[in-house]
Amino acid sequence: VQTCVLPILDGLTIPSKEAETNLHRLFNKVLEETDEEVIFNLDATASRRGGYHMFNEYGNIFLENRYTDWQNYYPYWTLRNLWMLSKYVPAEKLQIEFLNKWRNTDKYKGEVFAPENYSFEYLFATTLAGQPLAWMEGTNLPEEAFTLREHTEAYKKFQHDMHSGTILPIGDEPSGRSWTGFQSLKKDRGYLIVYRENHPEGTTEVDTWLPEGVTVRCIPLMGHGKAMTAVTGKKGRLEISLPSINDYVVYKYEIKNKR
């Protein structure tokens, strides 16, 4: 059996409690008739409608419109929105966009945080805690863009398991110059996604949701971090190293001893 994912439901307005009740009935009827093999994509960008605080039990949330044409796509803005919401909203429900960084470069001339200053892999990586959304036309992408396939294939291998954990923000708020990231918590294991933005230090200590004083084995799945075994400090602190600015690592971790 294959699950059907419906296109984005846009243009929706809920003007009254009666309308809200009727919409619930509609969604529930579709799920009942399809044996719950349908996922709705709900647009939360305008009007009075469902979003990350309501109706999110029915599928994914299309969170925001960002376009290089409008010069309102900055990778750290998108990452920051996901990071800030993830403490309160299931991150795995949020569709998070990455764009064609080769378009409209003239609109960002001289800007440190312009999309073209990041690798395409990094732009994709900023979306991993949510539902990655390639918010672009595939036409006229350069050949370089298609090397992303190896990274999307690597991601698919652990995406479901990572999304089945509780995803919370770690590190500092994304600012374009921070060490930041996410943690997916399961019982004695989970995942860490750590980003080094345009920060001068190649090594830092990141506060996590791990207990203090436990030994943690971290295996890199994506990005450019090295395998490590470390003991957590206060606030679950771990020392992380990444070789370059605007870089990242995805670790699968396991707690080896627990006090």
Where do the PLM segments sit?
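Solvent-exposed beta-hairpin/edge-strand motifs
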Residues: 209-225
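The substrate-binding groove and active-site-proximal loops of carbohydrate-active enzymes
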Residues: 7-20
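Carbohydrate-binding surface patches
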Residues: 173-214, 248-254
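Glycan-recognition surfaces
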Residues: 18-140
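C-terminal beta-strand-rich structural cap/linker in extracellular carbohydrate-active enzymes
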Residues: 6, 228-259
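A cross-family glycoside hydrolase active-site/sugar-binding cleft signature
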Residues: 7, 41-43, 193
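Positively charged, low-complexity/disordered segments
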Residues: 2-4
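Aromatic- and carboxylate-lined catalytic core of secreted/periplasmic carbohydrate-active enzymes
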Residues: 126-171
